[in-house]
């Protein structure tokens, strides 16, 4: 097959590309330029779109003897990821920009251009697996065999079309072995640290970034009874489950710590309460993605609402008429926020299968 290897400049994508070459595919490496000013992305920030990352990706492709290109997706990245991130916080949500980047840029936009140029698939270094059903057809997305690095959650927001054109060559290997393989091939990125920061906020100061783009929008912090506790500069400063940085002088009546339990973006009201007030027993999600035939009607499954977060058993009711699902949690979860992705899994001894996902739009508490 003729495949595009998405080269982030890290060790995982390097080994994924190498394995695709070894498998006999016609491979072309491509690095996505996502920053409109890559000079501002510090090399020490562990982002994924710095100039150094691009140089690392080029060196890997040179060693593999495959063509290398840089595609500028910075305008689309700003619109679909950065602007979406800002507007989500304005709406009182807690978005994950890496999920949006996967959904809109690293797969949808990349595939759109790749298919137009005659490529059959995209190869990435994500830790996930695709297995073919016994009756043929498109593969099912499964967890990686490395539970510490599994990225099936962040891929659960993809559509069936994207999954059908994906290859994840490193999903059947644990990370230490990937580094060993990279070192054996002489890749300079073999010991390169993993990236964790939001690439467009390289200093990690999300509040300062949002403050520059949203500005002051004063509102009140209130307790669960509606008593006003203090004024704040903007509800975007807060996320569900937040404890630190509230700076409330008046202690709670029971003396226990307070947590952000609700954000009303329309009024700018931030509600705080006890840890017990955080426990969610059910959620509603919209913008559904269907990745498996079992993602229909009512069924029992498991749900994950954060990358590397807890996985709990649940009862799912999919309403395809309005593209929503209700998920009743068998074990309450804390810190569940609107804007997060709820990814549904079917437990399986060979690796849990991703059935689909949705964006959380409402929660119900104990």
From Swiss-Prot:
EC number: 2.8.1.13
Keyword list, A-Z: ATP-binding, Cytoplasm, Disulfide bond, Nucleotide-binding, RNA-binding, Transferase, tRNA processing, tRNA-binding
A GO MF term: tRNA binding
SUPFAM superfamilies: Adenine nucleotide alpha hydrolases-like (SSF52402)
Positions marked as site (Interaction with tRNA): 126, 340
Active site: 101 (nucleophile), 199 (cysteine persulfide intermediate)
Gene Ontology cellular component annotations, sorted alphabetically: cytoplasm
Residue intervals passing through the bilayer: none
Domain of life: Bacteria
NCBIfam families the UniProt entry points to: PRK00143.1, trmU
Family: Belongs to the MnmA/TRMU family.
Name of the protein described by the UniProt record: tRNA-specific 2-thiouridylase MnmA
Protein species of origin: Corynebacterium diphtheriae (strain ATCC 700971 / NCTC 13129 / Biotype gravis)
Gene label: mnmA
């Amino acid at each position: 097959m003729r495949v595009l290897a998405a080269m982030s400049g890290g060790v995982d994508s390097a080994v994924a590309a190498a394995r695709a070459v070894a498998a006999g595919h016609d491979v072309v490496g491509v690095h996505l330029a996502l920053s409109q000013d890559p000079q501002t992305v510090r090399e020490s920030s562990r982002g994924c779109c710095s100039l150094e990352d691009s140089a690392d990706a080029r060196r890997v492709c040179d060693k593999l003897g495959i063509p290398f290109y840089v595609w500028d997706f910075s305008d689309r990245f700003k619109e679909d990821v950065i602007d979406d991130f800002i507007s989500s916080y304005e709406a009182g949500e807690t978005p994950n920009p890496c999920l949006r980047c996967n959904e809109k840029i690293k797969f949808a936009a990349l595939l759109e251009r790749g298919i137009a140029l005659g490529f059959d698939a995209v190869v990435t270094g994500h830790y996930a697996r695709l297995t073919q059903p016994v009756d043929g057809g498109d593969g099912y997305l499964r967890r990686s065999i490395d539970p510490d690095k599994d990225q099936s959650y962040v891929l659960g927001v993809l559509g069936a079309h994207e999954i059908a054109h994906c290859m994840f060559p490193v999903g059947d290997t644990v990370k230490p072995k990937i580094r060993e393989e990279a070192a054996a091939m002489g890749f300079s990125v073999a010991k390169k640290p993993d990236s964790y920061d939001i690439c467009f906020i390289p200093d990690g100061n999300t509040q300062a970034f949002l403050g520059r783009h949203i500005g002051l929008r004063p509102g009140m912090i209130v307790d669960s009874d509606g008593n006003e506790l203090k004024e704040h500069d903007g509800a975007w400063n807060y996320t569900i489950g937040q404890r630190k940085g509230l700076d409330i002088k008046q202690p709670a009546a029971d003396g226990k710590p307070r947590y952000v339990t609700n954000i009303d973006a329309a009024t700018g009201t931030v509600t705080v309460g006890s840890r017990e007030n955080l426990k969610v027993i059910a959620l509603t999600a919209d913008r559904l993605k269907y990745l498996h035939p079992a993602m229909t009607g009512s069924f029992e499954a498991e749900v994950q609402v954060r990358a590397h977060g807890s996985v709990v058993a649940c009862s799912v009711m999919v309403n395809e008429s309005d593209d929503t699902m209700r998920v009743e949690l068998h074990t309450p979860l804390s810190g569940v926020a609107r804007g997060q992705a709820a990814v549904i899994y079917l437990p399986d001894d060979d690796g849990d299968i991703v059935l689909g996902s949705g964006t959380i739009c409402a929660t119900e508490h104990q």
